Amino acid sequence: LKPYGRYFTPDPASLKSAMVGGIVMNNASGMCCGTHANSYRVLKSVRIILPDGTILDTGDKESRAQFLMTHPKFVRKIDDLRIKTQRNAVLCERIRRKYSIKNVTGLTILPFVEYNDPFDIIAHLMVGSEGTLAFLSSITVTTSEIQPYTASALLLFPTTKSACEAIIEMKQTGLLSAAEFFDRKAIRTVEKDFPELQGLPDDAGAVLIRTDAVTEKELLEKNKTLQKLLSYYS
């Protein structure tokens, strides 16, 4: 994708050895994509093989029509679950909140809240299913534009609270590509290599941030805005 100026947003630590199918079926994400650009968010359609040998391509009209003829009860049950879920406003809100943070526990139920088309629901149920629902043979996803200019910084804060507050403020600007928090114990593991970290308060925190931009000018403007925001914490 790089020659086309695009990239696949999920970026798990195992990216160099991972395959797209494995990333999707495990809902592997990484530091940068969070929940806004993980496998669930970039998925458009899937081609799957069900336990009975049926092949379904959710992005193909003929395949969908054929599946409706051969598996009407299956589709109807999916739609019944959707209707039952969406009628419960309290449950819907709880599901949205649970999946607004990284959540790979069990099978995802978010599609029943976010989609009305049963085939979109089926496709997104595959994310994180680890092969328990069907074999994933093909997937169509969206990609994002590569932003070639990047800046990163390790920020030190006197308290965990101030570090977390700074992350929230920086996130609200929409300028961050990634932010990772380190507590005092994590900082101690690298003190030997970075003596300047020694002597920090016991409640100190650190935040590793990254911001990306299409042009150098845009990157400088982003950095200037972030520096102004962070001056409050200095």
Residue ranges and their predicted role:
Residues 58, 139, 164, 171-234:
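Terminal amphipathic helices with adjacent charged low-complexity linkers/tails
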Residues 2-167:
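FAD-binding subdomain of flavoenzyme oxidoreductases
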